[in-house]
């Protein structure tokens, strides 16, 4: 018995068990009552039938009530308060002394708890602080709502539940679960154990284990009894406190002593292992790494799993899974090294005879972008946020490197856009690091240039290398997350040095009990997890044909195909289950289990597994299948400084004492500044804040506790103002002082003013004497006081005229002096005044000057050309410039004038602009001189330079022509006539009429039609003839006139090489046509044919093989040389041993298993035929195919073919007029005689020694490969179909592949709608499509409309709403898409389910409008449009039966656009559109699908079509395609979309989270305004790769344009200007 007053601690474990098979558990074993007690061996407990109150941590039990323990602030350590004013003394760690004690501490006998019990046990009471205590809940930051925002309830609560929070339903009694979808039975009294149960033992670590407090091993075992058909998942085991948690301190001491005595016992780990579906195999090589050894046990395991070498070279002391192994002596520290001279382990060096650890971090250069942390024998890299360890664990790389986002990779940038994508979507890292792609993604993101910082960020390993997520999965795993799996179906053999290990998950072993009794009560059908020992399902009643596993080993997908006598079955891998049809392994969606895993986090399903995404305040549990609350109160240092920390789910609370409040960051308590919160707290005083309180400091003149009382200083004695008047003021007083007195401010008395101390002082020139209230001035001789008596002023003695007789009197301060007047002055009234010489008598400066009087003299200002005498004032005289300057020289003479001068220039010269020089006259520019010659100016004259045949005239001012014929006489030209010409002459002959003399002396024909114009012949056409002309009828182009006056066609094809080597010229009336050979197309000039690059025009024609263009055709080259490309299946297969390459031929099975090719459809019943010796008659007739079809008469391959050409190729019958003679079988002697060389060869002229390959593509034209591309081979042919089609070997055409009919689900969780060449997926609300557009996922985070209203389920013929939904209100979208036909009190009608509005509102697809199929075929140019017929009823096949499982990229998706115009039958949609995807609809504008035939399914409710399906329209000229994309969404109201401005420059689309704006190209989304704003491409362009080369970038609305710089001109390359070439 424990002693009174002492307390101890023993562990109590709480296990939360969530049975996956709830009904079976409740049926087989009774649920325990809420008062059930967990029995711990060795601990006293009450009987199970007695109700027991268990108090929460921090509370004590008193009289069947739980009382909260209260401790003073700072009186107890954190979590050490045991009761009122009582602290819990710390207890040292208690190691286990013996196996019996160890078992008593960790072993539990347990029964499952009900959901109510689990909630009651985990619920914690949240205390509220009394009085002034502040209470803060720490939450993740959220956007503050504007005004009063109602609570959005996106959950649809079932069974009468009410949505009270965005993530919570308030469920009625007997129901539970997030959506109230689970039926939970009420509390039942305990019942005796039912025989036939199975006991499972789970061994796992404690979730909240702390070594410093608990002092026991962190591994515990839990025993659970459950039915054999139930599977139990233990999410976590926690330690909780209870009223019986008191022990004797002496018992603790004894246990501690016993533990020390047993220290030599072997170390063991309390864990048992058994196979389980989601665990690790023993071959994984990972185990627990233990940091401490306590009492014979390994304790304190590190989070996660490690290999033994990594553990022992680091901080571990022991390692193991089932048994604990001490680290090797050579892997420990320096004390463990025994051999003094032996080599040290890696990471150690010998110092003074011992091995010491090497600090690798001190050398530098390690852990790029991270922090290096030294460990024993090595080092580790700690990466900052946003970075991860790479596979070498020696550097940190950006998280963007392993982004799994995939998109198209473009190889060509052309005309400002992206083109030529590769065939599959890949990650940006693979695209750009391989340097194959130039841009990536739907927005055409340019790959960074090689060597740039952006390139090094996404390609840290350099060009040609990339990181995959699997390389970093071990390094980037969060603590507690599930490690990588090792499939149980593929066991591996451990090396000799490794040890078996188990995953960091609870393992269990099964203990069989007697068989349970059958329970007749039915239960819900829930999926059971697959068991590794399970051998396979039962053989289905009807399955595919036998031999499927040999023909198609991967028919089961993620599983193993097992042949059965009547078919096959599948053994599925872990995480997959057999499909309902029993023919495929499909993924098990663990997230849909009941109850779902990952609570309270979010579960994300993945193929074969799942993962948990935990919210803030939670962390992944040890099993990575749950989210555990983070106890922030256990942090070091603990939060809530100056207060008490209380943990809450996902956060924590700070309870602060009075005068304190929680800090803004919520991690501590801070003092409340009362002075700041209440500014007027102290009135006129100063508030001083104190820890937990405050006080007021009053200024002078105030008093009181809040400084509210004023002090009256005027009532004091003696009066404070002296001779002045005192006026009391608030907080002080004011003195009104008389003249001569002043106060120094409020509260200062009146004092005498010393005027003599002023600056400047009064009484200038005198002495100042201060008096009481005034002053006086004492002045010296010569001064007297002024009238105010404040200054001494000078006495002016010069006012007496007799002071200086005959002289001038000059007064000075205090005196005066007499002086005689200077020159230029005279005495006037006792003063000397100036004499004005300019106004007295004649002008002193003469007629050419201006007189200016000065003091005592004057000054003369002379006109130009005149100057005054120097040294004295006088009249202005003329200046002779000709004597003083070198004017008019050397071509003139200077002449002086009065006030100036003039130049007399020589002939040929004239005065300059200023008249001071003589300049040459340029006669050549002023007169028309030297006609027919060149005028050259000379100094003072000019001269004429005459051309040959000219001479100067008599006046030497012109050039005259020399008449050679007159001067040199008739002998100059002999017998011809001499004709003079300007500058020369010519000898001409006398020509006949209609001819004229040519330049070489010959007679040339005169073209009258050109010389006289078309008027010469009127309405006819003028045709020149030698010496004359004639008028002929006018013929059109391509025709020529006949001798009879008519027009006839010109045969351009007479020249056989007119159309080139790859075409045949066909003459047409008035024209011609070049018919190109296969693989060629007409050039722009129409005169020749050029090669067609099928690798660019036929996207995806080679599948995964490499497409190589050749002249007139193309090749599909397989990456592995032994393989060859099979065009019928689109795959590379081993080479066939047989010589035939005809479609449908069966090659021999290859040695290694490969992906099987598409087998031909099952043979249809053929018409009976009788043996025959040969056809009746010979010659050329019709060749038929598919003769067993009902319309066999229409199945004509070709006409005018021989019996051999038909039957030795692909024909099945030969004849005429539907009188068909069947071709002989290939194994018959008749066939061997007809076709001695086999199919595809003929014996020319009956010579069996020769053979000729038959070109089926040329012989049968487009009938042998309808809607495809036919390529001839030797022998046979290949038919290449576009993506989404396969070649039908009987119908000889490419037909649409119905992906929806394939065994592999095309749309997981949704409805599949097949389209021509592709398919689309649609989901029923509230499910939405994920990023792959092929899978429907839960939309838990979708934000619905705020406006709730009544939903009307029926609308009558008179538009009257009726039958409202009474259980709940709904939004407009919810009502129209799920429940009713009208919404709101105004009875707003919902859109019709076959309308565009309904499609856009509810995110569903509807059947297209039907129209006749457009006949297709590949002519010149190629067209898209396969003929649609009845669907094939056989086994469905797609382009690839199953995609390769290990490829790091996704197959190229089908064209997602609704109106994507297909200009070629293969490849992706056009990339000159703004976006790859748009949500307008599922069909293209080139053709519409045919009406559904037999077997075609439309998963829609039938209603009358109120509106036809809209046909797309071409955007108007000058408009953008983005505008047409937004048209289907323009009718969405702002209230529906939740966006106020309606997504300007974008369109409103529905996304899993609700609605958002999808911006057009050139715009980005501004999240603050939810509007699309223009992207300034010019500002965001990188300097290393400018947008405009040799040009200036100018931003425009939604785009940009380039303006070439001066000296540059635009080129054909977009946004690129080249130096302009100078014009010739």
From Swiss-Prot:
UniProt record, GO biological process: elastic fiber assembly; hormone secretion; protein folding; regulation of cell growth; regulation of transforming growth factor beta receptor signaling pathway; transforming growth factor beta receptor signaling pathway
Family: Belongs to the LTBP family.
Leader sequence residues: 1-27
Protein name (database record): Latent-transforming growth factor beta-binding protein 4
Organism classification: Eukaryota, Metazoa, Chordata, Craniata, Vertebrata
Sequence segments annotated as region (Disordered): 125-146, 474-546, 1130-1179, 1446-1524
Keyword Glycosyltransferase included in the entry's annotation: no
Composition-biased stretches (Pro residues): 1156-1168, 1446-1458
